[in-house]
């Protein structure tokens, strides 16, 4: 098992400009959560951008702590957060304002995501950018997909992609995060 103090974060991060972690890591064990916090704190001290994907998986939290107890402290050290409205509600109790999922008829409600972004950025003040992916499931083989980025209250929306012949949805969030990190490192304008 991983233990506090074993990893020399200053050496690991010596040439780094970005540290990304996912909510799956602290869900695995209390030691993994502690080492994740240790890494975040070291990255913060070294002025390295820290990002996370909340990526809540209820079935992984089995060591006696809730996601809310652990994730709040970890996310406080993040500059960039990706998470959907369901993860934000289950982990932090943040719900979209003036939103009734039963009245959407399965369609993506952009204002719900914007509400969650505002609330998350107000709660986690270090966070300067929040992003979400919006997936509309037309059926098991046909989805729509778009991304939204919130930067200091300004929202940028990708076009809506119509994805047909879906074989497996696994990895969409990971690929989005990789592209987002690349974009934020490469372009000076978040609209790009």
Where in the sequence are the language-model features?
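Conserved phosphate-binding/catalytic loop of the ribokinase/pfkB sugar-kinase fold
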Residues: 1-33
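Active-site glycine-rich loop that binds ribose-phosphate moieties when present
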Residues: 2-8, 34-38, 65-70, 111-115
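Short beta-strands and strand-loop turn motifs
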Residues: 18-25, 50-58, 85, 131-133
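Short strand->helix junction
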Residues: 26-29, 137, 187
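Surface-exposed amphipathic alpha-helices with a cationic face
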Residues: 37-44, 121
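Short, conserved structural micro-motifs that define repeat-unit consensus positions
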Residues: 44-50
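Conserved phosphate/ATP/ADP-binding segment of small-molecule kinases
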Residues: 46, 60-154
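Conserved post-catalytic alpha-helical subdomain immediately downstream of the catalytic base
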Residues: 156-192
């Amino acid at each position: 098992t991983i233990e506090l103090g074993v990893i020399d974060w200053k050496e690991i991060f010596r040439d780094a400009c970005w540290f990304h972690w996912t909510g799956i890591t602290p869900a695995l064990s209390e030691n993994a959560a502690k080492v994740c916090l240790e890494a975040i704190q070291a990255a913060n001290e070294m002025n390295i951008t820290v990002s996370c994907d909340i990526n809540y998986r209820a079935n992984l939290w089995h060591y006696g702590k809730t996601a809310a107890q652990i994730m709040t402290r970890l996310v406080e050290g993040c500059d960039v957060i990706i998470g959907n409205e369901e993860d934000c509600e289950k982990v932090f109790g943040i719900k979209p304002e003036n939103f009734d999922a039963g009245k959407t008829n399965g369609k993506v409600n952009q204002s719900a995501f914007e509400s969650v972004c505002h609330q998350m950025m107000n709660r986690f003040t270090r966070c300067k950018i929040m992003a979400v992916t919006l997936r509309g499931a037309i059926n098991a083989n046909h989805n729509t997909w778009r991304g939204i980025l919130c930067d200091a209250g300004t929202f940028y929306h990708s076009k809506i992609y119509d994805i047909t012949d879906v074989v497996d949805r696994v990895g969409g969030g990971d690929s989005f995060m990789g592209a987002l990190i690349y974009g934020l490192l490469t372009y000076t304008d978040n609209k790009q």
